[in-house]
């Protein structure tokens, strides 16, 4: 294990993976704990119950309590959205337009063809998709509003054909968020934040319509509220489990340390519980990146936040690139950046990652904003079972089958035997009666 002497907490330590025990290796890939405390769970449960029983009155009380805002009209008017659009500069509008164009292009390409096939003569099976009727989008506010998340959620919901799209964001809602909503054709915007916004969308109030599925990131209270409503019969489905943002960078000896450092810091500045990991077979590169991180930190407006994140982050020196991939697959990062000389050749070996960025010229921020891929990604190891958000998340699949008389006659013995094996007599009879009717007609 080698040390350097800069002051970025544990990120200043270069860890030799080969010299670590299995338990030490496991600890190195452990994420910061995010389990909701009993207090958060109880507070959120009370908020959900209160909103369910008191509706808009509870929403106004919580806005005053948590957001320090007296909200009269919960819904933002068309005039307010138009005014926000007028205040916003053309430069930002043009940037959003380009981002939307690329997001549209990528998500349009995800449309599934209808599956229509005869599995055997006279037995036709189809798979068709339908949009989820009503979806709710939660967009965080505060010191760093996220209009890009509006684009990432609003664009696929529109392409999918969702009949109703509801957006909630804490008051006062930033002009950028309101304009992004307008750009995506979202007309129902509500100035609501926190667990109360999730409750309003899950259960519905006089002002806020009940939705079928809720999308979007948030703090610990929002995350816990989404978890709770997804487990209630009268609640709503959710996009995916959420955790702090994270990135893992694999760099070889030819990588540019400043580029690698900038990508690591792009995630570290998200929040103190973010985690960033550098994997490299080159100890010289590892030290150069650690030094570049320290140098760039001094230029960041959110340097204090980034430093806190770096305290639970890692610089790991592996045996070779193959081992880097093995470690990355074990960790399953939200963002995986591969800055190697033949990055594309490694893709087939990657089994778990939310979004992958190949080469020196593919910064993680490109995917965050404008390349076209979605930036709503599984975190906290959920990449082993969850996918990046896409068009399919705003849709549902249905299957259709149609049997001709001859098709049923051919398949009937198979169905009857299996139904009998499971001792489901009515299932068997549904076939036997039809077969008898067909034989009478013959």
Swiss-Prot record:
Annotated residues for binding of Zn(2+): 267, 270, 368, 427
Binding site for NAD(+): 138, 196, 219
GO MF assignments: histidinol dehydrogenase activity; NAD binding; zinc ion binding
GO CC, alphabetical: cytosol
Annotated CDD domains: Histidinol_dh
Associated pathway: Amino-acid biosynthesis; L-histidine biosynthesis; L-histidine from 5-phospho-alpha-D-ribose 1-diphosphate: step 9/9
Pfam families reported in the protein's UniProt record: Histidinol_dh (PF00815)
Biological process, per Gene Ontology: L-histidine biosynthetic process
Signal peptide span: none
The entry's keywords: Amino-acid biosynthesis, Histidine biosynthesis, Metal-binding, NAD, Oxidoreductase, Zinc
InterPro entries: Ald_DH/histidinol_DH, Histidinol_DH_CS, Histidinol_DH_monofunct, Hstdl_DH
Cofactor: how bound: Binds 1 zinc ion per subunit.
Catalytic activity: L-histidinol + 2 NAD(+) + H2O = L-histidine + 2 NADH + 3 H(+)
Active site residues of this protein: 334-335
Names of required cofactors: Zn(2+)
EC id: 1.1.1.23
Enzyme class: oxidoreductase
Binding site for substrate: 245, 267, 270, 335, 368, 422, 427
Its biological purpose: Catalyzes the sequential NAD-dependent oxidations of L-histidinol to L-histidinaldehyde and then to L-histidine.
Membership in a protein family: Belongs to the histidinol dehydrogenase family.
Assembly and binders: Homodimer.
Protein name (database record): Histidinol dehydrogenase
């Amino acid at each position: 294990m080698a040390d350097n002497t800069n002051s970025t907490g544990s990120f200043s330590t270069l860890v030799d993976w080969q010299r670590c025990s299995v338990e030490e290796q496991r600890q190195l890939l452990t994420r910061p704990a995010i389990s909701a405390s009993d207090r958060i769970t109880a507070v959120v449960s009370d908020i959900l119950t209160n909103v369910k029983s008191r509706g808009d009155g509870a929403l106004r009380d919580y806005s005053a309590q948590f957001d320090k805002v007296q909200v009269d009209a919960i819904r933002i008017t068309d005039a307010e959205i138009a005014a926000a659009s007028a205040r916003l500069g053309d430069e930002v509008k043009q940037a959003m337009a380009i981002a939307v164009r690329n997001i549209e292009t990528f998500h349009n390409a995800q449309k599934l063809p209808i599956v229509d096939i005869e599995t055997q003569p006279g037995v036709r099976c189809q798979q068709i998709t339908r949009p989820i009727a009503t979806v709710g989008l939660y967009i965080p506010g505060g010191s760093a509003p996220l209009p890009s998340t509006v684009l990432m959620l609003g664009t696929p919901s529109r392409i999918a054909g969702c009949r109703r799209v509801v957006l909630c964001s804490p008051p006062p809602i930033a002009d950028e968020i309101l304009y992004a909503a307008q750009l995506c054709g979202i007309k129902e915007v509500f100035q609501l934040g926190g667990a109360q916004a999730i409750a309003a969308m899950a259960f519905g109030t006089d002002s806020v319509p009940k939705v079928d599925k809720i999308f979007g990131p948030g703090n610990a209270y929002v995350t816990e509220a989404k978890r709770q409503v997804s487990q209630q019969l009268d609640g709503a489905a959710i996009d995916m489990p959420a955790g702090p943002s994270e990135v893992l960078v694999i760099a070889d000896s030819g990588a540019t340390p400043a580029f690698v450092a900038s990508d690591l810091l792009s995630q570290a500045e998200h929040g103190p519980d973010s985690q960033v990991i550098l994997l490299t077979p080159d100890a010289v590169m590892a030290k150069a990146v650690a030094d570049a991180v320290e140098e760039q930190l001094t230029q960041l407006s959110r340097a204090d936040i980034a430093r806190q994140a770096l305290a639970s982050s890692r610089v790991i020196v592996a045996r070779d690139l193959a081992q880097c991939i093995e470690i990355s697959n074990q960790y399953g990062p939200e963002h995986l950046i591969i800055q190697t000389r033949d990055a594309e050749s490694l893709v087939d070996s990657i089994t778990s990652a939310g979004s992958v960025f190949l080469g020196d010229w593919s910064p993680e921020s490109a995917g965050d904003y404008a390349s076209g891929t979605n930036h709503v990604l599984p975190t906290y190891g959920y990449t082993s079972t969850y996918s990046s958000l896409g068009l399919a998340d705003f849709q549902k699949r249905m299957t259709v089958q149609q049997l001709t008389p001859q098709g049923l006659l051919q398949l009937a013995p198979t169905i009857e035997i299996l139904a009998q094996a499971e001792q489901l007599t009515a299932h068997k009879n549904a076939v036997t009666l039809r077969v008898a009717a067909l034989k009478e007609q013959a």
